[in-house]
């Protein structure tokens, strides 16, 4: 199931930091041979209110066992130690032990990057240990498993968290007979597989109204627990185990910081978090101690907003009066999303696809940051499905550039819709790239004990040089991983970045394109992923303080490298890395140019995940319904018909049963709690049966060297109970079965059925009964529900069957009674499911005709099949031959995707006898009797696939090819196409506006097989005559092809001339525009110059007037000062005169007083005065007595 293609050889850069690659091979092998062992722990004791956990043999999280050819580097030493250790943990994925140095990992880490051949890659990886525990016994494992869904009434398909099985990207298929778990190579591939299986079970999913339940939950931390102990949590939904946290040591608080997200859940009542204390590793037989639980009613966390609270832990034995008990902080949100049939969203989706820019501009000012994130996510997913995401991101980025103007440093540093959109798109299409580029590096960093703290205030000066060397080594390693990941860079991101570069160049700002690309990729994706690996699903565990500090410093250096900036005075302690930054700037520029180069688009794989378009449209509708209600009426009027469309969808959602299309059944309803009683999950099944079932981990052969990670976890039927468990592993360098042209098995799953319709009573309709005209009516391709099915086994495939009869209509039942209905294969186009020898890509399956234009599983044209159908000479002859040999055609249709002469592997029932994949094939079975009156005896020797009776498993009829069997593959690879390029044919084709329907594809397949029959068996009994006829036909066909090619050449020449003329006209128009703009520019410059001269003259006049006014003011000031001085002199003189007058007045008053006294004395004595005294005033104002003269 793993995505792949041909292995690419990654070439490391010949940089100075590959010095450690010169270490001797023996030393590197010793480094790789170190291993760690983890003691086993068993399930915790059962307490009242607690649920039983998994048995002691369930493996902990296990890394990938094969080196991915698409990953440039591998931490081989680290993986060696992990894989060689026993796989015995039960409770969680604990913090990786820090018992060795990161430098010990480095040689193997880099030697894997420098490996140039696949055999050297396989040599680096060790063989998995056969025995997992003391109770393991080797038992024969099934190489091929069959999953028969033909008679199942209830099938539950759900993902399995990596903490449960110890394996990434697993999903579980639960039927009435048990559960099977499958492992894929990436989350996108797992989602695609699950969706295809769901469509096999519910083909009418997109035409039915459905409800989806989504839970997002964070287990953040716990408090009031005893210190120096490790604790972990188990997450149960309605008492079914869904996930575990890692084991964390109690310091101040127990901090987990782990988030879980679950989709397609049944309706939930309660969410329960069980708390455990981990026991000592040395005490192997002790169980983990159960402490208690936290129960959250689903209704308490329902809604669009997250609910974050401290919840008390309910313990089995509460301790009264001793303070508060332990508490856990949990953040959760439970959503119920109602999804209408796709037809109801048609107008809404078309409007969003064509008017996204105006919508974003209108809503940007009123949305909160969280709402912007949710809306950007929905828009990106919808436009990715409709093929408009590149235009959407380019338009948003250019509007962001226009908004920021000259402030380029603000781009992608604000919470805008453009920033959130590129974040969501990077997470959508870049998850596997992120895992390939940095996954193993981050895991090795978690494992290492290197200290990279270089802040002098946080470490001693003696340790500073060593820490600086550690940080430089880690940064070199991280950047080396990043720049060598260009070979696995997502094709969609290359297209977007190339579009940005082209748009910036057309706007005359080519320099800003580099900033756009580096800011989006590093600032919003790679650097946050380095700082917080758990948020980007690189690892489940939140890093401890030292690792978090190391990751932060690496992210700082990487971000400065992407910004082409040095460390300054703000972080002077990091200045020692400036030399590294300068040295790597050139490589960073080369990397940015490589990932935006449109010429290398065909060298990378595209996005292969699944997008639930109905769910995204429903989420976007709810967001827009809430946001548009907050807009002003003037803004709403600019949105066109969007408010009316939103009202229509809201009305359909509010009306029960309004979303049900006529003639359809609600097959996509989520199974309720009662349905989970069939199988509540693999873990619960194992526990309730007291380990009586047999669990097998079996690695299947892969079609490419990369496809090594497919596992089946099965439970036996209970006929032969055994407590034993086994693990089988196929080494990468073990010899595979030699097949034709060196190819291996073709695909991993085939969902094609032989659809039967009940005909006359008592007359069974076999799978060989095909329409005589070679066509299947389009109405017969609609999927309903079956009565019977005939599972067909393809060699080496894990097959899934679901029989679906066609609704009986007058046009089909009367015109062709008893005809079977043949549905197109429901497999999706993924290059890894096709042979590397140039086999044609199988068309995408059709769940229903109404979802072709909206679902991500919509059909695409198959160029090889259409070309093969177009080259047939006579359609009528083909139809007649088809009517004569329907049985042979039916068998050849099943083998259409296989190469001739391939030895194949029989499919086996999980309860039947099992055989290793490397055992020799059994003898071919005798051919079955031919249908009466249908197949000539001469064709019996060519029958390859004898079909079992309806309802039986294919293990009773092995599919080994018998001697003399001849199969031909009609594909374009026979015309000289390269085998390596053929699996990528799907990605090279652009989105076609009109995809062929199921009728056209079916006719193309049947006609292609008819041509093969005509070529193999011939039409006449005379071989020489047939050869001559064939040569004449080939000659005439070659002449026709030559004439067609000549016509195409003439048309191409004419179009080229037209394009040249158009280009010349455009060039002349552009030249005129350039000249016009140049003249306008010169005119504007002249106008500005004149304005500047006028302003200069005005300024000179103003200055001269100011100077004259200043002189006048100076003169006035001098005159005023002189006047003030003269006045001051007068004032001084007057003051002196006043003083003298005051003195004279005083003397006069004294003289008057004396005279008055003399007169008064004389009057008393009676003496008359003689010679009265005369006073005279002198010139000085003094009085003088005249008698004294």
UniProtKB/Swiss-Prot annotation:
Residues 1-75, 653-679, 715-738, 804-823, 843-865, 895-998, 1015-1034, 1163-1189 are annotated as: Disordered. The keyword Membrane applies. InterPro entries: C2_dom (IPR000008), C2_domain_sf (IPR035892), DAB2P_C (IPR021887), PH-like_dom_sf (IPR011993), PH_domain (IPR001849), Ras_GTPase (IPR039360), RasGAP_CS (IPR023152), RasGAP_dom (IPR001936). It is found in: Cytoplasm; Cell membrane; Membrane; Cell projection, Dendrite. The keyword Membrane applies. The record marks 413 as: Arginine finger. GO terms for biological process: angiogenesis; cell motility involved in cerebral cortex radial glia guided migration; cellular response to interleukin-1; cellular response to lipopolysaccharide; cellular response to tumor necrosis factor; cellular response to vascular endothelial growth factor stimulus; extrinsic apoptotic signaling pathway via death domain receptors; inflammatory response. Residues 20-38 have a biased composition (Basic residues). One of its GO terms (molecular function) is mitogen-activated protein kinase kinase binding. Residues 101-202 form the PH domain. In response to TNF-alpha-induction, phosphorylated at Ser-728; phosphorylation leads to a conformational change, and thus, increases its association with 14-3-3 proteins, MAP3K5, RIPK1 and TRAF2 in endothelial cells; also stimulates regulatory p85 subunit sequestring and PI3K-p85 complex activity inhibition. Expressed in vascular endothelium of muscle and aorta, in smooth muscle cells of aorta and epithelial cells of lung. Expressed throughout the brain, including olfactory bulb, hypothalamus, cerebellum and cerebral cortex. Expressed in the soma and processes of neurons in a variety of brain structures, including the developing cerebral cortex, CA1 pyramidal neurons and Purkinje cells. Poorly expressed in medulloblastoma cells compared to cerebellar precursor proliferating progenitor cells (at protein level). Residues 669-679, 852-865 have a biased composition (Low complexity). SMART domains: C2 (SM00239), PH (SM00233), RasGAP (SM00323). PANTHER family: DISABLED HOMOLOG 2-INTERACTING PROTEIN, RAS GTPASE-ACTIVATING PROTEINS. Exists in a closed inactive form by an intramolecular interaction between the N- and the C-terminal domains. The proline-rich motif is critical both for PI3K-AKT activity inhibition and MAP3K5 activation. The PH and C2 domains are necessary for the binding to phosphatidylinositol phosphate. The Ras-GAP domain is necessary for its tumor-suppressive function. The C2 and GAP domains constitutively bind to MAP3K5 and facilitate the release of 14-3-3 proteins from MAP3K5. This is Disabled homolog 2-interacting protein.
């Amino acid at each position: 199931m793993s995505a792949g293609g041909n292995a690419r050889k990654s070439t490391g850069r010949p940089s100075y930091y590959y010095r450690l690659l010169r270490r001797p091979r023996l030393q590197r092998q010793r480094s790789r041979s170190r291993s760690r062992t983890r003691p086993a722990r068993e399930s915790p004791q059962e307490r009242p209110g607690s649920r039983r956990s998994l048995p002691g043999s369930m493996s902990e999280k296990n890394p990938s066992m094969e080196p991915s050819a698409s990953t440039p580097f591998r931490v081989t030493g680290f993986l060696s130690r992990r894989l060689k250790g026993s796989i015995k943990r039960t409770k969680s994925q604990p913090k990786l032990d820090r018992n060795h140095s990161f430098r010990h990992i480095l040689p193997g880490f880099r030697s894997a990057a420098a490996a140039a051949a696949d055999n050297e890659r396989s040599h680096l990886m060790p063989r998995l240990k056969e025995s997992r525990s003391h109770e393991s016994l080797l038992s024969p494992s099934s190489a091929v498993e069959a999953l028969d869904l033909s008679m199942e009434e209830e099938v539950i398909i759900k993902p399995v968290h990596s903490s449960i099985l110890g394996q990434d990207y697993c999903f579980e298929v639960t039927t009435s007979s048990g559960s099977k778990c499958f492992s894929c190579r990436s989350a996108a591939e797992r989602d695609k597989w699950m969706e295809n299986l769901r469509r096999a079970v519910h083909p009418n999913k997109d035409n039915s109204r459905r409800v989806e339940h989504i839970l997002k939950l964070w287990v953040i931390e716990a408090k009031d627990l005893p210190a120096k102990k490790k604790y972990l949590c188990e997450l149960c939904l309605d008492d079914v185990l869904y996930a575990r946290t890692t084991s964390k040591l109690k310091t101040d608080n127990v901090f987990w910081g782990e988030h879980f997200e679950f989709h397609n859940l049944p309706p939930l009542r309660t969410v329960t978090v069980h708390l455990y204390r981990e026991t000592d590793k040395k005490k192997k037989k002790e169980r983990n101690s159960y402490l208690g639980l936290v129960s959250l009613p689903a209704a308490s966390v329902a809604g669009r907003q997250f609910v974050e609270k401290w919840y008390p832990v309910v313990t089995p034995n509460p301790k009264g009066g001793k303070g508060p008990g332990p508490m856990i902080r949990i953040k959760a949100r439970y959503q119920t999303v109602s999804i209408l049939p796709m037809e109801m969203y048609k107008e809404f989706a078309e409007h969003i696809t064509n008017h996204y820019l105006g919508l974003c501009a209108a809503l940007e000012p009123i949305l909160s940051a969280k709402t912007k994130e949710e809306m950007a996510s929905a828009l990106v997913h919808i436009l990715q499905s409709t093929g408009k995401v590149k235009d959407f991101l380019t338009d948003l980025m250019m509007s962001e550039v226009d908004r920021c103007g000259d402030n380029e440093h603000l781009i992608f540093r604000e919470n805008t819709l453009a920033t959130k959109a590129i974040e969501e798109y990077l997470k959508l299409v870049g998850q596997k790239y992120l895992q390939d580029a940095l996954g193993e590096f981050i895991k090795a960093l978690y494992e290492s004990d290197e200290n990279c703290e270089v802040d002098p205030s946080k470490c001693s000066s003696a340790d500073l040089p060593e820490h600086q060397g550690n940080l430089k080594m880690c940064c070199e390693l991280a950047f080396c991983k990043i720049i060598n990941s260009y070979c696995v860079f997502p094709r969609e991101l290359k297209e977007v970045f190339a579009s940005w570069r082209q748009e910036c160049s057309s706007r005359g700002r080519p320099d800003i394109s580099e900033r756009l690309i580096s800011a989006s990729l590093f600032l919003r994706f790679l650097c946050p992923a380095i700082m917080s690996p758990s948020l980007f699903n690189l690892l489940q565990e939140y890093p401890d303080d030292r690792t978090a500090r190391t990751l932060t410093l690496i992210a700082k250096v990487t971000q400065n490298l992407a910004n082409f900036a040095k460390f300054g005075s703000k972080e002077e302690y990091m200045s020692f890395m400036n030399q590294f930054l300068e040295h790597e700037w050139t490589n960073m520029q080369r990397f940015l140019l490589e990932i935006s180069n449109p010429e290398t688009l065909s060298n990378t794989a595209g996005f292969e995940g699944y997008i639930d378009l109905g769910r995204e449209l429903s989420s976007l509708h709810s967001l827009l319904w809430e946001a548009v209600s907050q807009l002003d009426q003037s803004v709403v009027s600019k949105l066109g018909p969007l408010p009316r469309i939103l009202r229509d969808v809201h009305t359909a959602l509010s009306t029960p049963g309004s979303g049900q299309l006529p003639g359809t059944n609600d097959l996509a309803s989520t199974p309720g709690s009662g349905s989970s009683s069939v199988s509540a999950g693999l873990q619960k099944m194992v526990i309730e049966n007291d380990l009586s079932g047999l669990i097998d981990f079996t690695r299947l052969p892969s079609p490419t060297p990369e496809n090594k990670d497919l596992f089946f976890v099965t439970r036996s039927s209970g006929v032969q109970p055994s407590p034993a468990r086994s693990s089988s592993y196929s080494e990468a360098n073990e010899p595979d079965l030699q097949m034709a042209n060196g190819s291996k098995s073709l695909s991993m799953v085939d969902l094609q059925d032989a659809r039967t319709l009940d005909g006359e009573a008592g007359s069974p309709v076999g799978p060989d009964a095909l329409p005589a005209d070679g066509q299947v009516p389009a109405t017969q391709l609609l999927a309903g529900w079956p009565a019977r099915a005939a599972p067909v086994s393809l060699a080496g495939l894990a097959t899934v069957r679901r029989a679906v009869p066609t609704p009986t209509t007058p046009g089909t039942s009367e015109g062709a009674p008893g005809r079977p209905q043949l549905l197109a294969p429901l497999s999706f186009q993924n290059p890894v499911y096709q042979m590397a020898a140039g086999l044609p890509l199988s068309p995408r399956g059709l769940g229903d005709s109404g979802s072709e234009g909206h679902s991500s599983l919509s059909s695409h044209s198959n160029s090889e099949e259409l070309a093969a159908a177009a080259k047939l000479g006579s359609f009528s002859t083909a139809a007649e031959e088809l009517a004569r040999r329907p049985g042979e055609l039916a068998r050849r249709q099943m083998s259409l995707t296989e190469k001739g002469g391939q030895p194949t592997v029989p499919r086996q029932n999980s309860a039947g006898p099992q055989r290793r994949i490397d055992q020799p094939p059994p003898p071919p079975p005798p051919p079955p009797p031919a249908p009466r009156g249908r197949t000539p005896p001469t064709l019996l020797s060519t029958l390859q696939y004898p079909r079992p009776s309806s309802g039986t498993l294919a293990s009773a009829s092995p599919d080994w090819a018998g001697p003399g069997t001849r199969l031909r593959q009609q594909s374009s690879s026979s015309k000289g196409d390269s085998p390596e390029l053929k699996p990528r044919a799907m990605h090279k084709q652009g989105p076609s506006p009109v995809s062929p329907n199921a009728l056209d594809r079916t006719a193309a397949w049947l006609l292609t097989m008819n041509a093969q029959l005509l070529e193999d068996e011939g039409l006449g009994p005379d071989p020489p005559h047939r050869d001559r006829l064939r040569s004449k036909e080939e000659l005439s066909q070659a002449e026709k092809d030559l004439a067609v090619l000549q016509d195409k050449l003439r048309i191409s020449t004419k179009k080229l001339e037209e394009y040249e003329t158009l280009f010349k006209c455009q060039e002349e128009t552009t030249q005129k525009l350039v000249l016009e703009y140049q003249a306008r520019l010169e005119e504007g410059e002249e106008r500005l110059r004149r304005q500047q001269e006028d302003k200069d003259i005005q300024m000179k006049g103003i200055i001269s007037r100011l100077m004259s006014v200043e002189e006048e003011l100076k003169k006035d000031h001098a005159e005023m000062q002189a006047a003030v001085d003269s006045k001051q002199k007068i004032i001084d003189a007057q003051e002196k005169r006043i003083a003298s007058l005051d003195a004279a007045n005083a003397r006069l008053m004294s003289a008057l007083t004396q005279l008055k006294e003399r007169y008064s004395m004389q009057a008393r004595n009676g003496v008359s005065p003689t010679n009265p005294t005369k006073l005279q005033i002198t010139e000085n104002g003094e009085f003088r007595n005249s008698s004294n003269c």
